[in-house]
Amino acid sequence: MAKTAIAYKEKMKELSMLSLICSCFYPEPRNITAYTYDDMEIKQLNKRASGQAFELILKPPSPVSEAPRTLASPKKKDVSLGEIQAKLEAAEDRRKSQEAQILKQLAEKREHEREVLQKALEENNNFSRMAEEKLILKMEQIKENREYYLASLMERLKEKERHAAEVRRNKEQLELSG
């Protein structure tokens, strides 16, 4: 019971004075379920916790309503043969101009492709030439190092032969003197 009284007090705070007085005269709330406009009618179907549902009814056009207006097409003037020929010549000039522009764009594109290809070939040739020069320098360096190594090896061999000859000579002298 206490909960009901508290809820009633809260409800009374929410309601305006006018609503309170009206609720005294009309115990049931006023229910407006239909709204009418010129060419449509809106009916409230039901209220739910998730929202409200409405039905929209469109009225058929009344027979008294205005007939749809037809737009009058602009009056055509007589076109002479000279004007037609001038228009055809202008169209031909536009077509030729467009073709010339397209051909110019294609020529520029081809020229650009040619330049790119030429640059790529140049870079490839430069790379090949530089790689070949590096390889030649490396081979020359290897050849010089090998020649130096062989020369030092021959020098050591000659030194050993001289030493061996000197040892033999000393040995022979020892045998002859001894």
UniProtKB/Swiss-Prot annotation:
Recorded hits in InterPro entries, A to Z, give: Stathmin_CS, Stathmin_fam, Stathmin_sf
Domain SLD as annotated: residue spans: 38-178
Q: Which domain of life is it from?
A: Eukaryota
Q: What tissues express this gene product? A: Nervous tissue.
Q: How does it sit in the membrane?
A: Peripheral membrane protein
Q: Which residues form a coiled coil?
A: 75-178
For this chain, the family text in UniProt reads:
Belongs to the stathmin family.
Under the heading PANTHER family, the entry gives: STATHMIN, STATHMIN-2
What is this protein identified as? Stathmin-2-A
Species in which this protein is naturally found: Xenopus laevis (African clawed frog)
